[in-house]
Amino acid sequence: MKIEIGTIFPSHFKSSYPEEFELFSHFETTSGIPTAFFAVMGGLYQHTHTYANIQREACFGINFLPVSCYDRLINTIRGNEYEADEFQAGGFTVQDAKTIHAPMIQEAFINMECTLKDIQDLSGAGITAMVIGQVQHISVDEEYAQGYEKRYGKDGFMMLIPAPQDLKTGEPAQSAVATVNIERLD
């Protein structure tokens, strides 16, 4: 089951300090992601059908999956022809969004529903773009709804680390997939 949070401030949310929710969106504490009022995807390739879909539909979903789903995500890239069903290629379940008309991944521990705010050509040459969406709704899996344990660590947020170049030899390294760990509380 997922906990649903929309644009209306949840009355049961308590602030950590005075003015917290006057200064920051409640979406930041809902998702555990800084500035989650807006979702920014940098470096989205403009030749992809994802980019075309976002431009056409003026909305998009962001689905956060644990690193254990990485191989399934890679299957969606390998089966990425225009007519292909990427959900089926990855073995994911399609879930209807609450506020937009883009499909969501049911297995995601956090789903963010966004309306398109802006697109900027980062490359200046039609190669990559920064896509900015305004968050309309966030769904959080109940297991991830409390504390840090599930969101941060092996079952939480993951990110692709581009292959670093060896700065002495010039040799390329292999890309990596990382998870986020809490090192200390502030």
What do these predicted ranges mean?
Residues 1-186:
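Basic, polyanion-binding surface patches
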